[in-house]
Regions:
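Positively charged, small/polar-rich N-terminal and surface patches that mediate targeting and assembly
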Residues: 1-113
């Protein structure tokens, strides 16, 4: 089993959701602020006379759990849906999971997903 976590631009949330909803049993999307290694966005002030560099970028984090056999399909779908070709597209991390328990059904392992 794998835990896939993708930090993406917030405007790509719908595209990623559409891309993975048929591939996974469920997923979680969290919104927040992040700071990657890339350049920060420059923001103009209200009157347009000044600007400042944002300390953080708005990001969305998509988390899902899948069988090992499905991991590459899900990773590919997320990468394709979130790609803009510019810096700041995000990052996808994959972790191995030792076990899982569905609290409601009491199913364990891959059946819990």
């Amino acid at each position: 089993m794998k835990r896939i976590e993708a930090t993406i631009q917030t405007d790509k949330t719908s595209a990623v959701s559409d891309a993975i909803k048929e591939l996974v049993g469920g997923y979680t999307i969290l919104e927040g602020n992040g700071r990657g290694s890339g350049k920060r966005q420059e923001i103009r002030s209200g009157r347009g006379t000044g600007s400042f560099t944002a300390e953080y970028n708005k990001v969305a984090v998509v988390i899902t759990y899948v069988d090992d056999a499905d991991a590459e399909k899900v990773i590919s779908a997320i990468a394709s849906a979130s790609f803009t070709g510019k810096g700041g597209d995000g990052i996808i991390t994959v972790s191995s999971m030792e076990s899982a328990l569905n609290i409601a059904s009491k199913k364990t392992g891959s059946e819990a997903l």
